[in-house]
Curated annotation (Swiss-Prot):
The lineage of its organism: Eukaryota, Metazoa, Chordata, Craniata, Vertebrata. It comes from the Eukaryota. This is Protein MMP24OS. It comes from Homo sapiens (Human). Residues 36-55 have a biased composition (Pro residues). Residues 1-61 are annotated as: Disordered. Residues 1-10 have a biased composition (Gly residues).
Length: 71
């Protein structure tokens, strides 16, 4: 499917492997992410979270309502 995205200019182009070298530089970025988990990070206690608001996950919605003009 990646060939279809890179070869959107024409049907014969996706068969060629020339568009593929462009995604390859992005591949080294992927291995960097797995490197972080192997690093020992002792976390005996979960991170303290602020007190939950009565609105819970709707806090963002409440903010939008407060900032939106109602006529």
């Amino acid at each position: 499917m990646g060939a279809q995205l890179s070869g959107g200019r024409g049907a014969p182009e996706p068969a060629q492997t020339q568009p593929q070298p462009q995604p390859q530089p992005a591949a080294p970025e992927g291995p960097e992410q797995p490197r972080h988990p192997p690093q020992p990070q002792p976390q005996p206690q979960p991170q303290p979270q602020p007190e939950p608001s009565p609105w819970g996950p709707l806090d963002d919605v409440r903010f939008l309502i407060a900032c939106t003009s109602w006529y």
